[in-house]
Amino acid sequence: MERFTRLYPDRADGLTALDVVAALPGNAPDDRPWVCLNMIATADGRASIKGRAGNIANQADYELFHATRARMDGILVGAETIRVESYGRTINNAPARERRVREGLPADAVSVVATRRVSLPADVGLLRAPENTVIVLTPSEDGELPAEAAATVRYLREPDMAAGVRRLRGEHGLRALVCEGGPNLNATLLPAGLVDELHLVYAPKLAGGHDPLTILGGEVLDPPIELDLVTLHESGGYLYARYGVRTA
């Protein structure tokens, strides 16, 4: 088990990933889930190496990533990220599932897959795990995931992302979501005022390259969205920043 040092707002040593996420989630708004983006980037701003964010991470980040998931009702993610990052069972260890049950949550978090076209192959690990519940959030009026999917699959066909996120609260009871990207999904959520916090890992790596993929795609934000630092932790040279997203 990796250890973290809290650097801000005060110093504390020897913390575990569970300690770091103990205050999560925040208070949900009245009409939608509380949403945090959980992202990683190299020191020069790249959100992936060789196409995968997982190639940037270390063991401490892996533990914090899964500890964050385990505090949430659901995981919001784009279909391409699921394919590239090889998603499987949402809560991947028994102790975390047991903690969730003790805290009144289902053993596994719900996966919310945001996709313009309903297109995931049957061999994706997320669909092969019978314990998973998958909600497909899509503007498409047709299309379904492969019938041989072992996971429980539901569809939320909604052309407006903000309305879709609100329906996740009203119709599916999801009060807290972690969004794991990718950048285009992030760029849809943030300008729409649907994100409450950004959890950003700064990796001590330089990747280089032309036109690097960053954590936020889409058009340039004008004006930029302002952030407030809530906590800052360190482990193995990696920095783990938790920001509040300022509302307009």
Regions found by a protein language model. Name each.
Residues 1-248:
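Enzymes that bind and transform nitrogen-containing heteroaromatic metabolites
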